[in-house]
Amino acid sequence: MSQQHEATAAAAEKPLNNGYLQANAPLEELSATVVSPLLGQQQVQHQAPHQMQQQQQQQQQNKLPTVVFLAPDGSGGVGIQRGNPAQGNPGMVTGTGSHSDWLLKESQQRRRLLVLAIAFTVLGAAIGALAIYFASVHQRCHLYRLEPDNDDRPNGRWNQDSGSAHEGQDNICMTQECVRTAASLLSAMDLNSDPCEDFFQYACGTWNKMHPIPEDRSSISTFEVLSDQQQVILRAVLEEPIDERDNKATIKAKTFFKSCMDIPQIRKIGTGRLKQVLQSLGGWPVIERNWSPPADLSVERLMGQLRLNYSEPVMIELYVGADDKNSSVNILQMDQLQYALPSRDYYLKESSANDRRAYHRYMTQVALLLGADPATAAAELEKVVLFETQLVNVSLPEADRHDTSLVYRKMLLPELQELVPEVQWQEYLQAALGPGIPLQEDEPLVTYGLHYLTEMGKILAHTDRRVVHNYMLWRLVMSLMSHMIDEYQRERVEFRKILMGIQSERTRWSQCVEWTNKKLGVAVGALFIRDNFNQESKEVALEMIHTIRAAFNELLAENDWMDDETRAVAKEKADSMNERIGYPELLTNATELEQEYVNLTIVPDNFINNVLSILQWESEKMLRLLRQPVDKEKWTTEPAVVNAFYNPNKNDIVFPAGILQPLFYSQHFPKSLNYGGIGVVIGHEITHGFDDKGRQFDKEGNMMQWWNNATIEAFRERTQCVIDQYSRYKINEVDMFMDGRMTQGENIADNGGLKQAFRAYKKWETLHGREQQLPGLNMTHDQLFFLNYAQIWCGSMRPEDALTKIRSAVHSPGFVRVLGPLSNSRDFASAYKCPLGSTMNPAEKCSVW
């Protein structure tokens, strides 16, 4: 999910400040930790008002302003810095041999006094700023009806309406964790906005101002900041010297990362290995002076070799996976092509002509770098773009492919040969599987793009072989370009400037961390969990899953559009969901972990060879599943990612270790924040089992119609309400509206997850009582639940990224994920006392689950 900022080695060595204390950190009832690049970490004790006033007067007399800012690591911690943060730390004056000892000591003493003076000034300013800020918050909260009614006051001890800071003060949490959490929430908010008109601006307005989009990415969000923080951790564990705790798997991960970082060695190797690969595949015609089609390499054989040896599915998406109608059996599956550009609209819409020109230029410049003739390369590759556009044109738009049952088609190999006679399917599939997996004469297979395959065959039959060969090898070259450096990287950046709006490439270390985690994720996960995963998180998450699933079942029993029989089967499916939390157990078993990578060779001094080895290893590992039963207990995602998943074929919900952290979860958070964070994520994944796709699969993971027709029609009516609602959200960056069809499954899950998590939280509150309030916020925990949910989606995007999201993303942009579910929530409207008819409390709401 992200591209990363530069981080220092020192930052990698320290525990991250995520806005809460580590589990073993000492707690002080009335103190707060302030982190400043100038002074390091300081303990700030609460002081008497006259002391605060004196320090504020001293600050006003000083010429340099005091700046309150978010910690530069994006953690949400609050720092205080004197002067202009961009100027950096002042240099230290050191003594020379010409000074006497007493002068040196006096100089050192003066410096100490100066540092102490600055420290006291900064700490006083911090307290003064917080006092003023909290007073402002108190006033704003009353202005926008954040105060609860009398009936909401816990035991009548806290009289919010009076504004008293003394009555019921034991109900205010003043631990370091609570102060930090409150400061983190406040630092993101725009208190000048009305929460009943634009809750995204209210919750995230200041965060978005404080986090401009970096040059090396097309968007910024809290998700990406969390991923940035996690990448710093992963960098640290990958850079650790190999020691006795390592096994063959973790050594391979560290070795791959090291080879990726070895730029001098990569330069030394150059492009020789890439050119060898192209030559072994018949040569790339555009860079060959006298190219002719190899007699022993048909189009079908070349497609198969690209799939088997380089994980490159050209023209056809081919893979082995669970049969949707028999989820215990692996089967060959084929689908329409993967696009080189983000979506089919980039090839077909007139408004994307500039993107197509940039794509053609990128293709041409790379070919020139590899030795193509400048006089002919552009014209030759223009034919490639036209050929690719023809293929894209006969593919179906993703919005028309949401109903899996309509695109699923199971058949035997001879039937496919009869339907698409232009392709020699036996030759292609055997080349893709390799000699170790003999293809059966009546091999069963599933297609999800039969219309595309039929039309593709016709296009192939009428296209010159040179054009086809040029296209196929270009797709391999394009995939490998992200791993190239220097002039190849510069051409890629120029292309991405047009396509994505980015202005520079990411730092090398962040690229290497991402590739290592994606390619060797299980081994990286084993390194990550050693010191960066709290087992208590797993237990708490499991407890929350049970309470949120119970809330789903309650809501299921209350809905009035489902018949009793279907409702009973739906409950069975929800109760049968398997939970996978944190990481698979094999991460702690060195023997099993080593077996995972037993057929993979990684060398310390040849990065491009390592990349090619991994591509072949990945492909062979996946294709070997063909004759094997489906292992429904096996994890299919790496543990160190900030995400969560639902798999319809396994009916399981997965919450990797990477997402069990703030803002989603912390053992120090109030329950309202945890339920508004990871709780909504849990509800979201549960609801995926019943969205427009998930509802087509039973509790065993098999696609079948287990709803009656009346219930299906009622579901579609409610789904259409969601589609229509989200299609009315306008993306101002490009002056276009959302396509509610593309994102319907995720929108249904967002709305259902929010409702379930809030109900589960209220049940927890009934059983355990109300928690202490957070200081300075003057907000109820119901309000904090929705605030934390909203702040998960803080962020902004470039126009280029906005266009890509509209055209191809299955998730709505962050602001829509806030406004949509909250405006459908009666619980939210009640918590914030939004008048009926206000923007965030419309009279007509959409509800599916």
UniProtKB/Swiss-Prot annotation:
It comes from the Eukaryota. Keywords: Cell membrane, Disulfide bond, Glycoprotein, Hydrolase, Membrane, Metal-binding, Metalloprotease, Protease, Signal-anchor, Transmembrane, Transmembrane helix, Zinc. The chain crosses the membrane at residues 114-134. Pfam families: Peptidase_M13 (PF01431), Peptidase_M13_N (PF05649). GO terms for molecular function: metal ion binding; metalloendopeptidase activity; metallopeptidase activity. GO terms for cellular component: membrane; plasma membrane. The active site is at residues 685, 750. Disulfide bonds join 173-178, 196-834, 204-794, 260-512, 721-846. Its EC number is 3.4.24.11. It comes from Drosophila melanogaster (Fruit fly). It is a single-pass type II membrane protein. Glycans are attached at residues 309, 326, 393, 589, 599, 709, 778. Belongs to the peptidase M13 family. Expressed in the testicular tube, near and in the seminal vesicles. In adults and third-instar larvae, expressed in the midgut and in the mushroom bodies of the brain and neurons in the pars intercerebralis. Also expressed in neurons of the ventral ganglion and imaginal disks (wing and leg) of third-instar larvae. In stage 17 embryos, expressed in the peripheral nervous system, pharynx and midgut. Residues 41-63, 146-167 are annotated as: Disordered. Residues 1-113 are cytoplasmic. Residues 41-61 have a biased composition (Low complexity). Metalloendoprotease which functions in fertility and memory formation. Required in the dorsal paired medial neurons and alpha/beta mushroom body neurons for the proper formation of long-term and middle-term memories. Required in males to maximise egg-laying in female mates and is also required in females for their fertility. This is Neprilysin-1. Disruption phenotype: RNAi-mediated knockdown females lay fewer eggs and display a reduced hatch rate when mated to wild-type males, and wild-type females lay fewer eggs when mated to RNAi-mediated knockdown males. RNAi-mediated knockdown in the dorsal paired medial neurons impairs middle-term (MTM) and long-term memory (LTM), but has no effect on normal aversion learning and anesthesia-resistant memory (ARM). RNAi-mediated knockdown in alpha/beta mushroom body neurons impairs MTM and LTM. RNAi-mediated knockdown in all mushroom body neurons has no effect on learning and ARM. InterPro entries: MetalloPept_cat_dom_sf, Peptidase_M13, Peptidase_M13_C, Peptidase_M13_dom_2, Peptidase_M13_N. It catalyses: Preferential cleavage of polypeptides between hydrophobic residues, particularly with Phe or Tyr at P1'. Zn(2+) binds at residues 684, 688, 746. Binds 1 zinc ion per subunit.
